[in-house]
Swiss-Prot record:
It comes from the Bacteria. This is Gamma-glutamyl phosphate reductase. It comes from Gloeobacter violaceus (strain ATCC 29082 / PCC 7421). It is found in: Cytoplasm. The lineage of its organism: Bacteria, Bacillati, Cyanobacteriota, Cyanophyceae, Gloeobacterales. It catalyses: L-glutamate 5-semialdehyde + phosphate + NADP(+) = L-glutamyl 5-phosphate + NADPH + H(+).
Length: 419
Protein backbone atom coordinates (compact mmCIF):
# COMPACT_ATOMS: atom_id res chain seq x y z
CA UNK A 1 0.00 0.00 0.00
CA UNK A 2 1.41 3.39 -1.02
CA UNK A 3 1.78 5.76 1.93
CA UNK A 4 0.91 8.75 -0.28
CA UNK A 5 -2.37 7.12 -1.33
CA UNK A 6 -3.23 6.31 2.27
CA UNK A 7 -2.51 9.88 3.39
CA UNK A 8 -4.66 11.28 0.56
CA UNK A 9 -7.57 9.03 1.52
CA UNK A 10 -7.04 9.84 5.18
CA UNK A 11 -7.57 13.55 4.46
CA UNK A 12 -10.72 12.72 2.48
CA UNK A 13 -12.00 10.53 5.32
CA UNK A 14 -11.31 13.18 7.96
CA UNK A 15 -13.27 15.75 5.98
CA UNK A 16 -16.10 13.28 5.34
CA UNK A 17 -16.25 12.30 9.00
CA UNK A 18 -16.74 15.95 10.02
CA UNK A 19 -19.54 16.32 7.46
CA UNK A 20 -21.07 13.05 8.65
CA UNK A 21 -21.38 14.39 12.19
CA UNK A 22 -23.35 17.32 10.77
CA UNK A 23 -25.47 15.00 8.60
CA UNK A 24 -26.57 13.06 11.69
CA UNK A 25 -28.40 16.20 12.87
CA UNK A 26 -30.20 16.94 9.58
CA UNK A 27 -34.01 16.68 9.93
CA UNK A 28 -35.95 14.03 8.02
CA UNK A 29 -37.74 16.62 5.92
CA UNK A 30 -34.51 17.97 4.44
CA UNK A 31 -33.18 14.46 3.79
CA UNK A 32 -36.40 13.48 2.02
CA UNK A 33 -36.41 16.67 -0.03
CA UNK A 34 -32.82 15.93 -1.08
CA UNK A 35 -33.66 12.34 -2.06
CA UNK A 36 -36.52 13.50 -4.28
CA UNK A 37 -34.26 16.12 -5.88
CA UNK A 38 -31.66 13.41 -6.49
CA UNK A 39 -34.25 11.27 -8.26
CA UNK A 40 -35.19 14.20 -10.50
CA UNK A 41 -31.53 14.87 -11.27
CA UNK A 42 -31.00 11.27 -12.42
CA UNK A 43 -33.86 11.65 -14.88
CA UNK A 44 -32.60 15.03 -16.11
CA UNK A 45 -29.03 13.81 -16.62
CA UNK A 46 -29.90 10.42 -18.10
CA UNK A 47 -28.23 11.14 -21.46
CA UNK A 48 -24.89 12.07 -19.88
CA UNK A 49 -25.00 9.07 -17.55
CA UNK A 50 -25.81 6.64 -20.36
CA UNK A 51 -23.01 8.13 -22.46
CA UNK A 52 -20.54 7.50 -19.61
CA UNK A 53 -21.87 3.98 -19.27
CA UNK A 54 -21.33 3.34 -22.99
CA UNK A 55 -17.67 4.27 -22.49
CA UNK A 56 -17.43 1.76 -19.64
CA UNK A 57 -19.10 -0.97 -21.68
CA UNK A 58 -16.66 -0.45 -24.55
CA UNK A 59 -13.75 -0.61 -22.10
CA UNK A 60 -15.27 -3.73 -20.51
CA UNK A 61 -15.46 -5.52 -23.84
CA UNK A 62 -11.82 -4.62 -24.52
CA UNK A 63 -10.95 -6.07 -21.10
CA UNK A 64 -12.73 -9.29 -22.05
CA UNK A 65 -15.47 -9.09 -19.42
CA UNK A 66 -18.00 -11.91 -19.59
CA UNK A 67 -21.54 -11.28 -20.81
CA UNK A 68 -22.72 -11.76 -17.22
CA UNK A 69 -20.48 -8.94 -15.97
CA UNK A 70 -21.35 -6.73 -18.93
CA UNK A 71 -25.03 -7.18 -18.07
CA UNK A 72 -24.33 -6.03 -14.51
CA UNK A 73 -22.39 -3.07 -15.83
CA UNK A 74 -24.98 -1.99 -18.39
CA UNK A 75 -27.35 0.88 -17.72
CA UNK A 76 -30.53 1.41 -19.73
CA UNK A 77 -33.24 4.08 -19.54
CA UNK A 78 -35.35 1.52 -17.66
CA UNK A 79 -32.60 0.77 -15.14
CA UNK A 80 -31.96 4.48 -14.60
CA UNK A 81 -35.66 5.01 -13.97
CA UNK A 82 -35.54 2.14 -11.49
CA UNK A 83 -32.70 3.90 -9.67
CA UNK A 84 -34.71 7.12 -9.53
CA UNK A 85 -37.79 5.29 -8.25
CA UNK A 86 -35.66 3.61 -5.58
CA UNK A 87 -34.52 7.01 -4.29
CA UNK A 88 -38.15 8.16 -4.14
CA UNK A 89 -39.09 4.99 -2.27
CA UNK A 90 -36.31 5.62 0.25
CA UNK A 91 -37.65 9.16 0.73
CA UNK A 92 -41.09 7.71 1.50
CA UNK A 93 -39.77 5.28 4.12
CA UNK A 94 -39.82 6.05 7.83
CA UNK A 95 -36.59 7.63 9.04
CA UNK A 96 -35.06 5.31 11.66
CA UNK A 97 -32.84 8.03 13.14
CA UNK A 98 -34.19 9.21 16.48
CA UNK A 99 -36.65 6.33 16.83
CA UNK A 100 -37.15 5.25 20.44
CA UNK A 101 -36.85 1.47 20.49
CA UNK A 102 -37.20 0.93 24.23
CA UNK A 103 -37.27 2.65 27.57
CA UNK A 104 -37.79 2.12 31.29
CA UNK A 105 -37.62 3.82 34.67
CA UNK A 106 -34.73 3.04 36.99
CA UNK A 107 -35.54 2.40 40.69
CA UNK A 108 -33.64 5.61 41.50
CA UNK A 109 -35.99 7.57 39.23
CA UNK A 110 -33.79 7.77 36.13
CA UNK A 111 -35.53 7.67 32.75
CA UNK A 112 -33.54 5.37 30.42
CA UNK A 113 -34.39 5.51 26.70
CA UNK A 114 -32.80 3.55 23.86
CA UNK A 115 -32.63 5.61 20.64
CA UNK A 116 -31.58 4.79 17.06
CA UNK A 117 -28.59 6.75 15.73
CA UNK A 118 -26.47 6.59 12.56
CA UNK A 119 -23.39 4.36 12.45
CA UNK A 120 -21.13 7.13 11.12
CA UNK A 121 -18.94 7.20 8.03
CA UNK A 122 -19.31 4.02 5.95
CA UNK A 123 -17.01 2.71 3.23
CA UNK A 124 -18.71 0.72 0.48
CA UNK A 125 -16.63 -1.35 -1.95
CA UNK A 126 -18.38 -2.81 -4.96
CA UNK A 127 -17.74 -4.11 -8.45
CA UNK A 128 -19.44 -3.74 -11.84
CA UNK A 129 -22.84 -2.41 -10.71
CA UNK A 130 -23.36 1.33 -11.20
CA UNK A 131 -26.84 1.10 -9.66
CA UNK A 132 -25.17 0.40 -6.30
CA UNK A 133 -23.84 3.97 -6.38
CA UNK A 134 -27.34 5.45 -6.23
CA UNK A 135 -28.70 2.88 -3.75
CA UNK A 136 -25.75 3.34 -1.39
CA UNK A 137 -25.88 7.14 -1.47
CA UNK A 138 -29.65 7.13 -0.94
CA UNK A 139 -29.66 4.67 1.96
CA UNK A 140 -26.68 6.24 3.71
CA UNK A 141 -28.10 9.75 3.37
CA UNK A 142 -31.53 8.78 4.75
CA UNK A 143 -29.97 6.88 7.68
CA UNK A 144 -27.69 9.82 8.50
CA UNK A 145 -24.43 8.16 7.48
CA UNK A 146 -21.66 9.62 5.35
CA UNK A 147 -20.30 7.35 2.63
CA UNK A 148 -17.02 6.73 0.82
CA UNK A 149 -17.77 4.81 -2.38
CA UNK A 150 -15.18 2.66 -4.11
CA UNK A 151 -16.57 1.12 -7.30
CA UNK A 152 -14.80 -1.09 -9.80
CA UNK A 153 -12.42 0.31 -12.40
CA UNK A 154 -14.66 -1.12 -15.13
CA UNK A 155 -17.55 1.14 -14.01
CA UNK A 156 -15.58 4.25 -13.08
CA UNK A 157 -17.10 6.63 -15.66
CA UNK A 158 -20.65 5.54 -14.81
CA UNK A 159 -20.06 5.78 -11.06
CA UNK A 160 -18.48 9.22 -11.29
CA UNK A 161 -21.32 10.51 -13.47
CA UNK A 162 -24.00 9.19 -11.11
CA UNK A 163 -22.33 10.34 -7.89
CA UNK A 164 -21.57 13.81 -9.30
CA UNK A 165 -25.21 14.33 -10.24
CA UNK A 166 -26.50 13.03 -6.90
CA UNK A 167 -24.03 15.00 -4.78
CA UNK A 168 -24.87 18.26 -6.52
CA UNK A 169 -28.59 17.71 -6.00
CA UNK A 170 -28.15 16.70 -2.35
CA UNK A 171 -25.88 19.59 -1.39
CA UNK A 172 -28.20 22.07 -3.09
CA UNK A 173 -30.96 20.93 -0.72
CA UNK A 174 -28.91 21.46 2.44
CA UNK A 175 -27.07 18.17 2.90
CA UNK A 176 -23.59 18.90 4.39
CA UNK A 177 -20.94 19.00 1.68
CA UNK A 178 -18.29 16.31 1.85
CA UNK A 179 -20.40 13.53 3.36
CA UNK A 180 -20.59 11.74 -0.03
CA UNK A 181 -17.32 10.91 -1.79
CA UNK A 182 -16.68 8.73 -4.87
CA UNK A 183 -13.14 7.36 -4.66
CA UNK A 184 -10.96 6.33 -7.63
CA UNK A 185 -11.58 2.88 -9.06
CA UNK A 186 -8.00 1.61 -8.76
CA UNK A 187 -7.65 -1.65 -6.82
CA UNK A 188 -4.96 -0.13 -4.56
CA UNK A 189 -7.64 2.11 -3.04
CA UNK A 190 -9.29 -0.92 -1.41
CA UNK A 191 -6.29 -1.75 0.77
CA UNK A 192 -6.02 1.83 1.99
CA UNK A 193 -9.76 2.29 2.53
CA UNK A 194 -10.19 -0.77 4.75
CA UNK A 195 -7.52 0.54 7.15
CA UNK A 196 -8.89 4.03 7.68
CA UNK A 197 -9.23 3.78 11.44
CA UNK A 198 -10.66 5.61 13.31
CA UNK A 199 -12.52 7.53 10.63
CA UNK A 200 -14.65 4.73 9.20
CA UNK A 201 -17.31 3.13 11.36
CA UNK A 202 -17.86 0.25 8.95
CA UNK A 203 -16.80 -1.18 5.59
CA UNK A 204 -19.26 -3.10 3.41
CA UNK A 205 -17.80 -5.12 0.51
CA UNK A 206 -20.28 -6.06 -2.20
CA UNK A 207 -18.99 -8.31 -4.97
CA UNK A 208 -17.46 -11.68 -5.70
CA UNK A 209 -15.84 -14.12 -3.31
CA UNK A 210 -12.27 -12.88 -3.89
CA UNK A 211 -13.16 -9.25 -3.09
CA UNK A 212 -15.14 -10.11 0.03
CA UNK A 213 -12.48 -12.55 1.25
CA UNK A 214 -9.71 -9.96 0.77
CA UNK A 215 -11.61 -7.32 2.73
CA UNK A 216 -12.54 -9.68 5.57
CA UNK A 217 -8.95 -10.91 5.92
CA UNK A 218 -7.20 -7.54 5.69
CA UNK A 219 -9.51 -4.88 7.13
CA UNK A 220 -8.75 -3.17 10.42
CA UNK A 221 -12.10 -1.38 10.17
CA UNK A 222 -15.22 -3.40 11.18
CA UNK A 223 -16.66 -5.30 8.18
CA UNK A 224 -20.25 -6.19 7.34
CA UNK A 225 -19.88 -9.22 5.09
CA UNK A 226 -22.39 -9.30 2.24
CA UNK A 227 -22.77 -12.69 0.83
CA UNK A 228 -21.82 -14.88 -1.96
CA UNK A 229 -25.06 -16.68 -2.83
CA UNK A 230 -24.67 -20.43 -3.31
CA UNK A 231 -28.44 -20.84 -2.92
CA UNK A 232 -30.20 -24.24 -2.88
CA UNK A 233 -33.72 -25.43 -3.62
CA UNK A 234 -34.69 -28.78 -2.10
CA UNK A 235 -37.60 -30.59 -3.78
CA UNK A 236 -38.93 -32.90 -1.08
CA UNK A 237 -40.80 -36.17 -1.61
CA UNK A 238 -44.18 -34.51 -1.02
CA UNK A 239 -43.52 -31.50 -3.29
CA UNK A 240 -46.18 -30.43 -5.76
CA UNK A 241 -44.60 -30.89 -9.19
CA UNK A 242 -46.01 -27.79 -10.88
CA UNK A 243 -45.08 -25.62 -7.91
CA UNK A 244 -41.55 -27.01 -7.95
CA UNK A 245 -41.20 -26.33 -11.68
CA UNK A 246 -42.32 -22.71 -11.33
CA UNK A 247 -40.04 -22.05 -8.37
CA UNK A 248 -36.94 -23.68 -9.86
CA UNK A 249 -37.25 -21.90 -13.21
CA UNK A 250 -37.91 -18.53 -11.58
CA UNK A 251 -35.01 -18.91 -9.16
CA UNK A 252 -32.52 -20.04 -11.80
CA UNK A 253 -33.60 -18.46 -15.08
CA UNK A 254 -35.05 -15.02 -14.30
CA UNK A 255 -31.65 -13.42 -13.49
CA UNK A 256 -28.84 -15.96 -13.22
CA UNK A 257 -26.19 -13.32 -12.47
CA UNK A 258 -27.56 -12.18 -9.09
CA UNK A 259 -26.73 -13.51 -5.63
CA UNK A 260 -30.27 -14.70 -4.82
CA UNK A 261 -30.50 -16.93 -7.90
CA UNK A 262 -30.58 -20.69 -7.28
CA UNK A 263 -27.26 -22.40 -7.99
CA UNK A 264 -28.05 -25.90 -6.69
CA UNK A 265 -31.07 -28.18 -6.85
CA UNK A 266 -31.53 -31.06 -4.40
CA UNK A 267 -34.13 -33.68 -5.29
CA UNK A 268 -35.44 -36.44 -3.00
CA UNK A 269 -34.75 -39.91 -4.39
CA UNK A 270 -38.48 -40.78 -4.37
CA UNK A 271 -39.16 -37.99 -6.89
CA UNK A 272 -36.47 -38.84 -9.44
CA UNK A 273 -38.91 -40.33 -11.94
CA UNK A 274 -41.87 -38.04 -11.27
CA UNK A 275 -40.13 -34.69 -10.66
CA UNK A 276 -36.52 -34.78 -11.84
CA UNK A 277 -37.39 -35.61 -15.46
CA UNK A 278 -39.68 -32.57 -16.02
CA UNK A 279 -37.34 -30.31 -14.05
CA UNK A 280 -34.44 -31.33 -16.28
CA UNK A 281 -36.61 -30.82 -19.35
CA UNK A 282 -37.45 -27.27 -18.19
CA UNK A 283 -33.83 -26.41 -17.45
CA UNK A 284 -32.60 -27.73 -20.81
CA UNK A 285 -35.37 -25.81 -22.59
CA UNK A 286 -34.19 -22.55 -20.99
CA UNK A 287 -30.58 -23.10 -22.04
CA UNK A 288 -29.29 -23.93 -18.57
CA UNK A 289 -26.16 -26.07 -18.40
CA UNK A 290 -26.86 -28.87 -15.92
CA UNK A 291 -24.18 -30.58 -13.87
CA UNK A 292 -25.01 -33.37 -11.48
CA UNK A 293 -24.16 -36.15 -9.07
CA UNK A 294 -23.69 -39.71 -10.42
CA UNK A 295 -27.40 -40.54 -9.99
CA UNK A 296 -28.43 -37.42 -11.93
CA UNK A 297 -25.91 -38.15 -14.70
CA UNK A 298 -27.16 -41.74 -14.93
CA UNK A 299 -30.72 -40.47 -15.28
CA UNK A 300 -29.98 -37.98 -18.09
CA UNK A 301 -26.98 -38.32 -20.45
CA UNK A 302 -27.14 -34.57 -21.24
CA UNK A 303 -26.09 -33.79 -17.66
CA UNK A 304 -22.38 -33.15 -17.09
CA UNK A 305 -20.66 -34.76 -14.12
CA UNK A 306 -20.23 -32.32 -11.21
CA UNK A 307 -16.89 -32.15 -9.42
CA UNK A 308 -16.32 -31.34 -5.76
CA UNK A 309 -15.56 -27.72 -6.71
CA UNK A 310 -19.06 -27.35 -8.18
CA UNK A 311 -20.95 -27.91 -4.94
CA UNK A 312 -19.58 -24.84 -3.18
CA UNK A 313 -19.44 -22.57 -6.22
CA UNK A 314 -21.60 -19.52 -6.96
CA UNK A 315 -21.94 -19.70 -10.75
CA UNK A 316 -23.72 -16.38 -11.43
CA UNK A 317 -24.40 -17.88 -14.84
CA UNK A 318 -26.79 -20.17 -16.71
CA UNK A 319 -25.46 -23.22 -14.86
CA UNK A 320 -27.00 -25.36 -12.12
CA UNK A 321 -25.81 -28.47 -10.27
CA UNK A 322 -28.25 -31.18 -9.14
CA UNK A 323 -27.86 -33.65 -6.27
CA UNK A 324 -30.20 -36.56 -5.49
CA UNK A 325 -30.56 -37.04 -1.72
CA UNK A 326 -32.00 -39.90 0.30
CA UNK A 327 -33.71 -37.84 3.00
CA UNK A 328 -34.55 -34.36 4.23
CA UNK A 329 -31.88 -34.79 6.90
CA UNK A 330 -29.29 -35.35 4.18
CA UNK A 331 -30.55 -32.27 2.31
CA UNK A 332 -30.24 -30.13 5.45
CA UNK A 333 -26.73 -31.39 6.20
CA UNK A 334 -25.69 -30.86 2.56
CA UNK A 335 -26.98 -27.28 2.49
CA UNK A 336 -25.39 -26.37 5.82
CA UNK A 337 -22.07 -27.78 4.57
CA UNK A 338 -21.96 -26.23 1.09
CA UNK A 339 -24.27 -23.22 1.43
CA UNK A 340 -23.11 -19.65 1.99
CA UNK A 341 -25.74 -18.71 4.61
CA UNK A 342 -27.63 -16.60 2.08
CA UNK A 343 -31.01 -17.99 0.90
CA UNK A 344 -32.23 -21.60 0.94
CA UNK A 345 -35.61 -23.07 -0.04
CA UNK A 346 -37.70 -26.21 0.36
CA UNK A 347 -40.67 -27.24 -1.77
CA UNK A 348 -42.89 -29.50 0.32
CA UNK A 349 -46.51 -30.25 1.21
CA UNK A 350 -45.53 -31.50 4.67
CA UNK A 351 -45.85 -28.90 7.44
CA UNK A 352 -43.64 -30.75 9.93
CA UNK A 353 -40.95 -31.21 7.28
CA UNK A 354 -41.07 -27.49 6.50
CA UNK A 355 -40.78 -26.66 10.19
CA UNK A 356 -37.75 -28.95 10.61
CA UNK A 357 -36.11 -27.42 7.54
CA UNK A 358 -36.57 -23.79 8.61
CA UNK A 359 -35.34 -24.56 12.13
CA UNK A 360 -32.23 -26.44 11.01
CA UNK A 361 -31.02 -24.41 8.02
CA UNK A 362 -28.42 -21.77 8.86
CA UNK A 363 -29.14 -18.93 6.41
CA UNK A 364 -30.22 -15.30 6.35
CA UNK A 365 -33.46 -16.24 4.56
CA UNK A 366 -35.17 -19.64 4.50
CA UNK A 367 -38.10 -20.19 2.13
CA UNK A 368 -40.97 -22.65 2.17
CA UNK A 369 -42.65 -23.08 -1.22
CA UNK A 370 -41.25 -19.85 -2.68
CA UNK A 371 -38.37 -18.68 -4.87
CA UNK A 372 -35.08 -17.51 -3.38
CA UNK A 373 -35.32 -14.49 -5.70
CA UNK A 374 -37.34 -12.64 -3.04
CA UNK A 375 -34.25 -12.01 -0.88
CA UNK A 376 -34.01 -8.36 -1.80
CA UNK A 377 -34.38 -5.08 0.05
CA UNK A 378 -37.12 -3.85 -2.27
CA UNK A 379 -39.08 -7.10 -2.04
CA UNK A 380 -38.78 -7.09 1.77
CA UNK A 381 -40.17 -3.55 1.90
CA UNK A 382 -36.84 -1.87 2.75
CA UNK A 383 -36.89 0.32 -0.38
CA UNK A 384 -33.38 -0.66 -1.42
CA UNK A 385 -30.41 -2.44 0.09
CA UNK A 386 -26.65 -2.11 0.43
CA UNK A 387 -26.36 -5.88 0.11
CA UNK A 388 -27.39 -9.16 1.69
CA UNK A 389 -25.54 -9.79 4.94
CA UNK A 390 -24.66 -13.44 5.52
CA UNK A 391 -23.13 -12.87 8.94
CA UNK A 392 -24.95 -12.64 12.26
CA UNK A 393 -23.44 -9.43 13.65
CA UNK A 394 -24.67 -6.79 13.51
CA UNK A 395 -27.19 -7.30 10.71
CA UNK A 396 -28.39 -10.34 8.76
CA UNK A 397 -30.25 -10.49 5.45
CA UNK A 398 -31.05 -7.42 3.32
CA UNK A 399 -29.24 -4.37 4.72
CA UNK A 400 -31.63 -1.45 4.63
CA UNK A 401 -32.12 1.75 6.63
CA UNK A 402 -32.56 0.18 10.07
CA UNK A 403 -29.51 -2.05 9.58
CA UNK A 404 -27.42 1.08 8.90
CA UNK A 405 -28.12 2.39 12.41
CA UNK A 406 -27.08 1.47 15.92
CA UNK A 407 -28.52 2.59 19.26
CA UNK A 408 -27.46 4.70 22.18
CA UNK A 409 -28.94 5.16 25.65
CA UNK A 410 -30.19 8.57 26.74
CA UNK A 411 -30.46 8.71 30.53
CA UNK A 412 -32.31 11.62 32.15
CA UNK A 413 -32.27 12.33 35.86
CA UNK A 414 -32.78 15.02 38.47
CA UNK A 415 -29.45 14.94 40.26
CA UNK A 416 -29.25 11.23 41.09
CA UNK A 417 -25.93 9.73 42.17
CA UNK A 418 -25.21 6.02 42.45
CA UNK A 419 -25.70 4.78 46.02
Amino acid sequence: MESSLYETLKVTAQRAQRSTMALAQVPSGIKNKALRAMARSLRTAHSEILESNTTDLEFGRQMGLSETLLDRLKLTPQRLEGMALSLEQIAALKDPVGEIVGGWRHPEGLEIVRVRVPLGLIGIIYEARPNVTADAIGLCLKSGNGVLLKGGKEAENSNQAISSVLKAAAYEQGIPEGCIEQLPGERAVVEALIRLNPYLALVIPRGGHSLIDFVVRNATVPVLETGVGNCHIYVAASADLEMARRIVINAKVQRPSVCNAAEKLLVHRDTVVTHLAPLLEDLHAHGIEVRGCPRTVAFDPKVKSAGEEDWGKEYLDKIIAIKVVDSTREAIDWINHYGTRHSEAIVTANYEEARRFTAAIDAAAVYVNASTRFTDGGEFGFGAEIGISTQKLHARGPVGLVELTTTKYVVSGSGQIRP
